[in-house]
A protein has these predicted regions:
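Short glycine/serine- and small hydrophobic-enriched flexible loop segments
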Residues: 62-69
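NAD(P)-dependent Rossmann-like dehydrogenase/reductase catalytic/cofactor-binding core
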Residues: 1-2, 8-12, 22-47, 69-70, ...
Length: 149
């Protein structure tokens, strides 16, 4: 049984359990019991690239980056629209900064390679930012500027 957690871990109640071809039902039930005891709500997913949440979130972040690059709106407006429009805890660009732009890029590149699907082709601006060392909160600069420590 594989599993995936989400950033930031605290406050996230869901955990994804990846089921492979040889995964036994008993193993899944034991994993579910274990994670429920930790206060998590397990969801089952076929063992596929990205499972559920990372696969979908990466597309949302990538489209937000493309929208920014195309001048559809500024970063703050994109984030406010998503926070208020669909009740996200954070906008996709701020979330990307928290995760790390290098991590987001790696997920997108991995999904594109694994699936062969161009939906996961990373936005050009995302690649440029990572090459420039703008990795988000960890580097002090991403879609937003942060206090460097």
């Amino acid at each position: 049984v594989g599993f995936a957690t989400f950033y930031p871990l605290e406050g996230k109640k869901v955990i994804e359990l990846g089921t492979g071809l040889r995964t036994q039902e008993q193993a899944l039930q034991e994993a579910e019991t274990f994670f429920r005891a930790l206060g998590k709500e397990p969801v089952r997913a076929k063992d596929a690239p990205g499972l559920i949440f990372p696969r979908i979130l990466s597309l949302i972040i990538n489209e937000a980056v493309r929208s920014l690059d195309e001048g559809v709106a500024q970063a703050e407006e994109i984030d406010v629209a998503m926070r208020l429009g669909v009740n996200y805890p954070s906008g996709p660009l701020r979330w990307a900064d928290q995760i790390g732009l290098d991590e987001v890029l790696a997920v997108l590149e991995g999904l594109q390679q694994e699936t062969g699907d161009d939906r996961y082709r990373p936005a050009a601006l995302l690649k440029k930012m990572v090459l420039a060392g703008w990795l988000g909160e960890s580097s002090g600069r991403g879609f937003y500027k942060y206090n460097e420590t």
